[in-house]
């Protein structure tokens, strides 16, 4: 069964995991979120009822 032979796929999995954890992840963590969380309570918008044209 070729699925149990770790030679072809284990190195690819290990290389991609190391690439993600050592190169891509630190670059992504340096970004600052555009909308930081705030301590204000959420405000529900006040809506007006829809006026149907046939009523």
From Swiss-Prot:
Main subcellular location: mitochondrion
Molecular functions per Gene Ontology: proton transmembrane transporter activity
Keyword Zinc among UniProt keywords: no
GO cellular component: mitochondrial membrane; proton-transporting ATP synthase complex
Domain of life: Eukaryota
Keyword list, A-Z: ATP synthesis, CF(0), Hydrogen ion transport, Ion transport, Membrane, Mitochondrion, Transmembrane, Transmembrane helix, Transport
Keyword Cell membrane among UniProt keywords: no
Membrane topology summary: Single-pass membrane protein
Matching Pfam families: ATP-synt_8
InterPro entries documented for this protein: ATP8_metazoa (IPR001421), ATPase_protein_8 (IPR050635)
Localization per record: Mitochondrion membrane
GO biological process: proton motive force-driven ATP synthesis
Residues passing through the membrane, by range: 10-32
Protein family per UniProt: Belongs to the ATPase protein 8 family.
Function noted in UniProt: Subunit 8, of the mitochondrial membrane ATP synthase complex (F(1)F(0) ATP synthase or Complex V) that produces ATP from ADP in the presence of a proton gradient across the membrane which is generated by electron transport complexes of the respiratory chain. ATP synthase complex consist of a soluble F(1) head domain - the catalytic core - and a membrane F(1) domain - the membrane proton channel. These two domains are linked by a central stalk rotating inside the F(1) region and a stationary peripheral stalk.
Subunit structure: Component of the ATP synthase complex composed at least of ATP5F1A/subunit alpha, ATP5F1B/subunit beta, ATP5MC1/subunit c (homooctomer), MT-ATP6/subunit a, MT-ATP8/subunit 8, ATP5ME/subunit e, ATP5MF/subunit f, ATP5MG/subunit g, ATP5MK/subunit k, ATP5MJ/subunit j, ATP5F1C/subunit gamma, ATP5F1D/subunit delta, ATP5F1E/subunit epsilon, ATP5PF/subunit F6, ATP5PB/subunit b, ATP5PD/subunit d, ATP5PO/subunit OSCP.
Protein name, UniProt field: ATP synthase F(0) complex subunit 8
Organism: Loxigilla noctis
Gene transcribed to yield this protein: MT-ATP8
């Amino acid at each position: 069964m070729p699925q149990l032979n770790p030679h072809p796929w284990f190195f690819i999995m290990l290389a991609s995991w190391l690439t993600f954890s050592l190169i891509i992840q630190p670059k992504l963590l340096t970004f600052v979120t555009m909308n930081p969380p705030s301590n204000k309570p959420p405000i529900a918008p006040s809506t007006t009822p829809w006026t149907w044209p046939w009523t």
